[in-house]
Amino acid sequence: MGKSKGKSQKGKIILGIFAILFIVIFVLYKSTNKMKYKDIKLPDSELGINEEMITKEKDKNVTNILLLGVDDEENASDSMMVISMNKDKGNLKLTSIMRDSYIFFGDDKVNKINYAYHYGGPELSIKTVNENYDLDIRDYVKVDFDGLDNIIDGLGGIEMDITSEEVPLIKGLKKHGKQTLTGSQAVDYSRIRKVGTNDYGRTDRQRKVMQEILGKLSGMSVTQYPKLISSFSEYVETSISTTELLGMASKASGFKNSSMEELRIPIDGTHKDEYIDDIFYLKWEREENVKAIHNFIYGE
């Protein structure tokens, strides 16, 4: 990723896949009821949404959804992303939030943004992101890492170019270079933090894995989606109703702008590394990053 944002190399296929997946997930949800649905009944004030954001939401016609990749062993979100759908401009944008970003939860707690899930589940995750970045998120989609494992295995694995430094950190791998990774190996790869630029390298690997998944999906027949999704739908939890899913799918399928822009928060030059009680944190400057994410999502 560039300093703040860049076009996805496979952006041209994302919107079609996005729409198809939502439709198929809806059908599977109705027929198998494997996907978990969790309604969030909290008012906007308890989700950290202020009056100014409610007005902006209506003016800009943007819907933001929090995507959580959850590590069940740590009971924390290993990855946090905000997907933004602009229904007027007809585009999607993806914002990645660094998991080590410092957020104060208490003197005796782990003060990282990904631990919002640990202390209060998806509701606190939504509230924390809203309050710290002045956003208007009401819904989420959560995927367990076992789900990612199953998705990739269902696709027959993905091809990645592995460095010699990465090989020892991926179970069952014997050589470096281009090769097909299994689901568990791809998860190992996406979670490497000790090679390269720590968490920055890790988010780059996660993006490469996602691009490969999208590439494989684009080459599949629509008739193959139900079998694939039924194998991992039990690992998905969301607060989005089936009616809302259909509405989003309908909107996305009509989008003319076929690229997805990406942003990483905090942006370069607005953060520093710091250790507190021997725990690593990413201290970041709020004003600059709120401005950056608003410029990115709302076009201000």
Where does each model-flagged region fall?
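Non-catalytic, solvent-exposed segments at the cell envelope interface
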Residues: 2-5, 11-12, 16-18, 22-300
